[in-house]
């Protein structure tokens, strides 16, 4: 593990797109590791040279890559499955639950990323009853309001680790405690935090967790993951399934399904190996730097962001207490969409969300000078 002072960026030379740009968008798409290109070329070489025999090497990599993700999340060995995205894994878990009885409610926050709401809204056709917990300000939801929505009728609580609209962290422990009191399960979405905040899924005691690689984990799109608590792994048999979830996929047995006795039971068809292999170098870089050092550096730079914003009278909806925010800061400036596009044209990479503002997400490779470059450009564009 590399030890670094909070103000010292590291491993900038391991990335392809940091020179010639000011890369402040790791909350949306992490920078591209040079080793990811090597993995892509290696995949091509395996495919072009070995054809179908490449599967002999590719398939064991699924478990290796899953274990690497698990090590970044405090997840025990054998509790992570790989898949294309969070939407697919929401569907997988939904298909494993029974909504025919009194315990048929699915509780989620109104500030959930929309894909979650789309999947579960569709499951109302199959007996699920949705309980959506409202937000007063569109940025946060009181913990006690979420807890009050969880009852003996709740089958599953779907919880954001951090809200995508504001970066506010959620009190996971309090919600899990309430869910345990009434026998409900909890699924935690860590897409907004994995790779920038230390997470211990085993300690949090959630039943499921979902996320993906293309944000802070610097893994590019297409490598999502599902965590299932160790004592629940063999409890579920998803109907959203496929041949790779079978106990003996290469036996090509006809139905009925015989599920794998591993996390492969939560997968479906032929795995997208290219996405998994390309994601792994990013995961390795996160492990090399270490999440405590990453978080410390991120807090230092987001604190600098807040100070520069305050000096200019720029409002931010992001929590000011670092213990209550994820890895990015939002700046609520007039004509934010236009200014964001102008920044991108200067190769200062940020993004914009309506109702939130310009989002800036520094990572372990970000320098303090890059924060000042951003504000210098803002000073010009806001005149």
Across the structure, where does each feature detected by a protein language model lie?
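Pyridoxal 5′-phosphate
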Residues: 1-383
């Amino acid at each position: 593990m590399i030890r670094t002072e909070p103000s010292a960026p590291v491993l900038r030379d391991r990335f392809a797109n940091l020179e010639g740009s000011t890369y402040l968008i790791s909350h949306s798409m992490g920078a591209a590791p040079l080793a990811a290109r090597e993995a892509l070329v290696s995949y091509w070489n395996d495919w072009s040279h070995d054809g179908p025999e490449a599967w002999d090497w590719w398939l064991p990599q699924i478990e290796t890559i899953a274990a690497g993700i698990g090590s970044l999340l405090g997840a025990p060995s054998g509790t992570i499955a790989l898949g294309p995205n969070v939407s697919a894994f929401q569907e997988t878990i939904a298909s494993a639950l029974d909504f025919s009885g009194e315990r048929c409610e699915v509780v989620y926050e109104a500030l959930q990323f929309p894909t979650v709401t789309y999947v579960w809204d569709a499951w109302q056709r199959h007996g699920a009853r949705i309980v959506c917990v409202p937000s007063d300000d569109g940025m946060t939801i009181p913990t006690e309001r979420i807890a009050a929505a969880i009852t003996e009728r709740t089958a599953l609580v779907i919880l954001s680790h951090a809200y995508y609209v504001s970066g506010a962290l959620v009190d996971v422990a309090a919600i899990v405690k309430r869910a345990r009191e009434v026998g409900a399960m909890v699924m935690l979405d860590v897409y907004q935090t994995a790779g920038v905040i230390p997470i211990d899924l085993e300690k949090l005691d959630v039943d499921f967790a979902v996320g993906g690689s293309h944000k802070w984990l610097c893994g590019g799109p297409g490598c999502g993951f599902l965590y299932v608590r160790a004592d629940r792994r063999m409890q579920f048999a998803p109907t959203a399934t496929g041949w790779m979830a079978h106990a003996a996929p290469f036996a090509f047995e006809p139905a009925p399904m015989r599920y794998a006795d591993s996390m492969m039971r939560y997968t479906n068809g032929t795995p997208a190996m290219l996405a998994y292999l390309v994601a792994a170098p990013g995961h390795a870089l996160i492990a090399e730097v270490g999440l405590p050092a990453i978080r410390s550096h991120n807090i230092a730079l987001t604190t600098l962001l807040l100070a520069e914003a305050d000096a200019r009278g720029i409002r931010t909806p992001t929590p000011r207490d670092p213990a209550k925010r994820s890895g990015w800061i939002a700046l609520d400036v007039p004509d934010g969409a236009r200014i964001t596009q102008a920044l991108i044209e200067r190769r200062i990479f940020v993004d914009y969300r309506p109702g939130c503002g310009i989002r800036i997400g520094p990572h372990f490779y970000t320098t303090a000078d890059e924060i000042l470059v951003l504000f210098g450009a803002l000073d010009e564009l806001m005149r």
